[in-house]
UniProtKB/Swiss-Prot annotation:
This is Thrombin-like enzyme agkihpin-2. Residues 1 form a propeptide. SUPFAM superfamilies: Trypsin-like serine proteases. Pfam families: Trypsin. It comes from Gloydius halys (Chinese water mocassin). Thrombin-like enzyme that shows fibrinogenolytic activity against bovine fibrinogen alpha and beta chains, but not gamma chain. Hydrolyzes fibrin. Enhances ADP-induced human platelet aggregation. Has arginine esterase activity for TAMe (tosyl-arginine methyl ester) substrate. Reduces thrombin-induced thrombosis. Does not have hemorrhagic activity. Reduces the motility of human liver cancer HepG2 cells in a wound-healing assay. It is found in: Secreted. PROSITE patterns: TRYPSIN_DOM, TRYPSIN_HIS, TRYPSIN_SER. InterPro entries: Peptidase_S1_PA (IPR009003), Peptidase_S1_PA_chymotrypsin (IPR043504), Peptidase_S1A (IPR001314), Trypsin_dom (IPR001254), TRYPSIN_HIS (IPR018114), TRYPSIN_SER (IPR033116). One of its GO terms (cellular component) is extracellular region.
Length: 237
């Protein structure tokens, strides 16, 4: 996923989960309480397995746990999200997890993010912009929260709207970015969980081609309503 930085510290990503189908790790996600994971809608697949407390794909942690989805919730039909809107999915685990050395939830944000913030993102995604090279352990990188227009202007072919519930983040000179396999993972700005990795350019980490993240703060009411049992809750327009 992550280009341009190093392996995450084993103790800094207790909330990071890995989504597998068969034996393939295809997305990340974020544990937000003992029973719920937040990820991207485009990470919806059949037969998802969720690994929690994982660092190395080859050498399991003693407290690593596996779950499967009990329920999945979307703002819209899972096929109706767009590049700029509603790429968000809530997964209820089939049984709760307990906090442990390598498992603990990340709380939802208490305030919206500010442009200019330094944000950290992470995942097991590709670590080469041109080769199918995937790491054994998650990589972490610091990037900047940018004006939304910085994601709109470089991609005229997507016809992105003038405003959106999407965050734009990256390094304008390139070299640091999320990449294939990082989707669904967290964007953490000033210590708060603000974004869900949604989409970016391919090849990754090109100059003036930052990536887009679903804005968690704008979806708080929907998230909290679903968790509280109000499954008819609607997302922000």
């Amino acid at each position: 996923m992550i280009l341009g930085d190093d392996e995450c510290n084993i103790n800094e990503h207790r909330f990071l989960v890995a989504l597998y189908t068969s034996r393939t790790l295809f997305c990340g996600g974020t544990l937000i309480n003992q029973e719920w994971v937040l990820t991207a809608a485009h990470c919806n697949m059949e037969d998802i397995q969720i690994k929690l407390g994982m660092h190395s794909k080859k050498v399991p942690n003693e407290d690593e746990q596996k779950r499967v989805p009990k329920e999945k919730f979307f703002c819209l039909s899972s096929k109706n999200y767009t590049l700029w809107d509603k790429d968000i999915m809530l997964i209820r685990l089939d049984s709760p997890v307990k906090n442990s050395a390598h498992i603990a939830p990340l709380s939802l944000p208490s305030s919206p993010p500010s442009v200019g913030s330094v944000c950290r993102t992470m995942g097991w995604g590709r670590i080469s912009s041109t080769k199918e090279t995937y790491p054994d352990v998650p990589h972490c990188v610091n990037i900047n929260l940018l004006e939304y227009e910085m994601c709109r202007a470089p991609y005229p072919e997507f016809e992105l709207p003038a405003t959106s519930r999407t965050l734009c983040a990256g390094i304008l000179e390139g070299g640091k970015d999320t990449c294939v396999g990082d989707s669904g993972g967290p964007l953490i700005c000033n210590g708060q969980f603000q974004g869900i990795a949604s989409w970016g350019d391919d090849p990754c980490a090109q100059p003036h081609k930052p990536a887009a993240y679903t804005k968690v703060f704008d979806h708080l009411d929907w998230i909290e309503n679903i968790i509280a049992g109000n499954t008819d809750a609607s997302c922000p327009p």
